[in-house]
């Protein structure tokens, strides 16, 4: 039988077995999972995007709706 894969908890670096027996994976615990969620909510973590990306995404929201008369 093969050894289960082990990963590091992203919050505390504790080893975590990657299996169904570890329901919080990749975190070692629900506490570490909530700490990470809080970091995303307070914008300590962010996905990098180009400065113009947001403008492109929402530029259509600023345009007046077209009316077909």
Curated annotation (Swiss-Prot):
Residues 48-69 are annotated as: Disordered. Interacts with GyrB. One of its GO terms (molecular function) is DNA topoisomerase type II (double strand cut, ATP-hydrolyzing) inhibitor activity. Zn(2+) binds at residues 9, 12, 28, 32. Keywords: Metal-binding, Zinc. It holds the Pfam family YacG. Its cofactor is Zn(2+). It comes from the Bacteria. GO terms for biological process: regulation of DNA-templated transcription. The gene is yacG. Belongs to the DNA gyrase inhibitor YacG family. This is DNA gyrase inhibitor YacG. Binds 1 zinc ion. The keyword Zinc applies. Inhibits all the catalytic activities of DNA gyrase by preventing its interaction with DNA. Acts by binding directly to the C-terminal domain of GyrB, which probably disrupts DNA binding by the gyrase. NCBIfam families: PRK00418.1.
């Amino acid at each position: 039988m093969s050894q289960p894969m082990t990963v590091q908890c992203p919050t505390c670096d504790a080893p975590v077995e990657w299996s169904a027996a570890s329901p919080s994976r990749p975190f070692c615990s629900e506490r570490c999972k909530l700490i990470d969620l809080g970091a995303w909510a307070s914008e300590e973590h962010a996905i990098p995007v180009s400065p113009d990306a947001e403008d492109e995404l929402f530029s259509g929201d600023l345009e007046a709706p077209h009316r077909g008369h």
